[in-house]
Amino acid sequence: MRSLLLFTFSACVLLARVLLAGGASSGAGDTRPGSRRRAREALAAQKIEVLVLLPRDDSYLFSLARVRPAIEYALRSVEGNGTGRKLLPPGTRFQVAYEDSDCGNRALFSLVDRVAAARGAKPDLILGPVCEYAAAPVARLASHWDLPMLSAGALAAGFQHKDTEYSHLTRVAPAYAKMGEMMLALFRHHHWSRAALVYSDDKLERNCYFTLEGVHEVFQEEGLHTSAYNFDETKDLDLDDIVRYIQGSERVVIMCASGDTIRRIMLAVHRHGMTSGDYAFFNIELFNSSSYGDGSWRRGDKHDSEAKQAYSSLQTVTLLRTVKPEFEKFSMEVKSSVEKQGLNEEDYVNMFVEGFHDAILLYVLALHEVLRAGYSKKDGGKIIQQTWNRTFEGIAGQVSIDANGDRYGDFSVVAMTDTEAGTQEVIGDYFGKEGRFQMRSNVKYPWGPLKLRLDETRIVEHTNSSPCKSSGGLEESAVTGIVVGALLGAGLLMAFYFFRKKYRITIERRNQQEESNIGKHRELREDSIRSHFSVA
């Protein structure tokens, strides 16, 4: 009996030790395959309310009709058998509301009205707006309300100040300042220090203005000189004035305008003999969209041959394009959805479409880490901090966000490599995270290895299509003008001399007559006064 009691006591002690050991190992972090799954299942299913603020007007490249298919594609991925099932608690669902932001205060009003209608209930995530003037007040309110805000817009330089009013903003598309960093690396590669900025500014969206503002600020910080010329391409374009400005400013010209306007400018400078290697022209293709000048010279008109020659001096800066099978599938689905909306165009997938898709993936990654750390979806500041300073796989390749919550920009430079056929290829790439620009070694440049090493201080003699003589002296018309001008000047001097002489004689005679008359009138007045006083 005593042995039975000892055996029972020993078994109890052994069982207690096993249980304690299990608890200790669990508290230290169980790394067995099923442990993470059980921890994730312990979290409650999440209902994520997303407010998308984008314009309904399809004239914008980031309209709801264009971007919504990309957002829904990403949501199907994270809610289905993709990223979301691995990262979020089972049963998590996204409830998305789409509101018209326009490009002004409507975005702010939509946010405030929605919160008021929900009796103070705020969304868990804001996607958009894109336009600077729409994004600014929404970003300030998001910071005040502790709401994470992810946008493929708000690209102007002012939004990089995240310490106060824009603290809850993450930009998932390269900001304009990133374009400036790319141009700076390009200039350092070619040993240039001066640039002329020529751009269209309609005073509304002002995309080109904000783009070259970013270039200007980066250049200014690094001691590079810039001068600027702006025009409104929606009105009559004074090409002669643009050419005169370029001739009187810098040798390296950075342009931003629509594709048709860039073509007109290049034709104009070509006709003035400015595409023979004395200038370097760069065109910025914004947003991976051909509407902002993709470097295409062909229009099927009578100017094609001339434009092909002109474009041999033009290089186009565009976002680096990567192709992977998933991106092709994504592009086809977006194209199908957009066409159902009645939109038929070439650029179904631009920078904004890609950016908002990747914004969903980035938010899910950040939310996963916040929930795992014991916080909730309402901890907007914690979530937004998890979106910064990280790299993840986007729909078109790797996406890297810097420590300030801004996406690094990877860019390519496209130029004409076959002047006979007019073929254009990528000749160089810039990798934003490394800050590195490199020319491609397998490309034949039509200008040779030293053509772009411009002498920025040398004065250029400009020619145009009209015949002219350059004999070193004055032309016949100039001499004739000088002689005629001298004769006219002499005639005017003689006429003035004789007029002045005649006028002086006339004045002297008139003065003599007036003095005689004044003497008579004085005597009469004095006699009248004396007679009056005598009578008095």
Swiss-Prot record:
Disruption phenotype: Half of the mice dies before weaning. They display reduced ability to concentrate urine, a lower blood pressure, and skeletal abnormalities. Despite a reduced half-life of NPPA in the circulation, the plasma levels of NPPA and NPPB are not affected. It is found in: Cell membrane. Disulfide bonds join C103-C131, C208-C256. Residues 27-40 form a propeptide. Belongs to the ANF receptor family. Has low affinity for peptide hormones in the absence of bound chloride. Receptor for the natriuretic peptide hormones, binding with similar affinities atrial natriuretic peptide NPPA/ANP, brain natriuretic peptide NPPB/BNP, and C-type natriuretic peptide NPPC/CNP. May function as a clearance receptor for NPPA, NPPB and NPPC, regulating their local concentrations and effects. Acts as a regulator of osteoblast differentiation and bone growth by binding to its ligand osteocrin, thereby preventing binding between NPR3/NPR-C and natriuretic peptides, leading to increase cGMP production. This is Atrial natriuretic peptide receptor 3. It comes from Mus musculus.
